[in-house]
Amino acid sequence: LNVDPGKATNRTVVTFVGHTEAVIEAAFLAIKKAGELIDMSKHKGEHPRMGATDVCPLIPVSGISMEETAEWAVKLASRVGKELGIPVYLYEAAQPDKKRSNLSVIRAGEYEGFFKKIKDPLWQPDFGPAEFDEKRGGTVIGARDFLVAYNINLNTTSTRRANAIAFDVREAGRNVVENGIKINQPGSLKSVKAIGRYIDEYGVAQISMNLTNIQVTPVHIAFDEVCRKADARGVRVT
């Protein structure tokens, strides 16, 4: 359906659709080929990442349930781990342990931090070796609903200010300390993940968002809220 490469992120998103067995086979072959062509030890980019195939979500489009899609995700993850020897983590609907189901939580530490993280008993992969592959890294495979990736540029080059706005709006919010106690302060938008980052090719900072349920938070609501939060911090959306 689409191939979307990004220069600053050094990342390409490939979207394809088809019958279940064909999609699973295509995904497996794509993961295999990415591992052959991409050397993660030399990779740099503005987007969080942990492997040559960073994440592989399966999405039920028609004639298949989320539960069935999750079962296929597990089958694909098992095959990747066994046949390719890549550490694989399940996420979203395919992950039974909800403490490990969030992509950003799994990917925390990124490629550079996973050599240590994978040794933690709490972060053993679901499939494949508990050894981080220097060239191919690891991958995350799961089943989820449709997601809208939406970026908003700001009239600033400050990643710090962009992150502050991202934390204002994202559902996870930020951790703050009150009376010596660390508490979570939720953001204003449900079903939204967001980070701030500087995009060299544009020369500006931006809010990079994933809208995980556009029935809960549609694009126009996310845009308006980012505008409000940016304005409150003396920043404009461009």
Name each model-derived stretch.
Residues 1-238:
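Long, contiguous binding/interaction regions
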